[in-house]
Amino acid sequence: MAENQNYGTGRRKSSSARVFIKPGSGNIVINQRSLEQYFGRETARMVVRQPLELLDMVGKFDLYITVKGGGISGQAGAIRHGITRALMEYDESLRGELRKAGFVTRDARQVERKKVGLRKARRRPQFSKR
């Protein structure tokens, strides 16, 4: 691919995204599909666009993204994290603004495991007094 592109890896829950950005017209391609085709939910599309909208760079970059693992929400979060990292590689002076918005920090929350003797991670079986 082109030499003038920047790369960022993003992760969220069990999803990981590889994001390549290069100067362009604002075209976003995720796993060979457009943003609208890939994410049916408007909330997921909004999450993906957040870093670009924050910096007023929506129409300035073309994004080529590959994402795998997890569900819709996790993938959207991973893409957002990847875009943020790629933008910081492009221009380090953007870090402060992105950090203030909370996009730089990796969201470390994971699904809590199910425990033996419980129905779910914390849900206990119904208690019967008699």
From Swiss-Prot:
**Per the UniProt record, which residue ranges are transmembrane?**
none
Recorded hits in InterPro entries, A to Z, give:
Ribosomal_Su5_D2-typ_SF (IPR020568), Ribosomal_uS9 (IPR000754), Ribosomal_uS9_bac/plastid (IPR023035), Ribosomal_uS9_CS (IPR020574), Ribsml_uS5_D2-typ_fold_subgr (IPR014721)
Gene Ontology terms, MF aspect: RNA binding; structural constituent of ribosome
A GO BP entry is: translation
| Alphabetical UniProt keywords | Ribonucleoprotein, Ribosomal protein
Q: Name one GO cellular component term.
A: cytosolic small ribosomal subunit
Classification via SUPFAM superfamilies: Ribosomal protein S5 domain 2-like (SSF54211)
Top-level lineage group: Bacteria
What is a single Pfam family found in this protein's UniProt entry? Ribosomal_S9
Family to which the UniProt record says this protein belongs: Belongs to the universal ribosomal protein uS9 family.
Cross-referenced HAMAP family, in alphabetical order?
Answer: Ribosomal_uS9_B
Name of the molecule in the record: Small ribosomal subunit protein uS9
Q: Which organism is it from?
A: Erwinia tasmaniensis (strain DSM 17950 / CFBP 7177 / CIP 109463 / NCPPB 4357 / Et1/99)
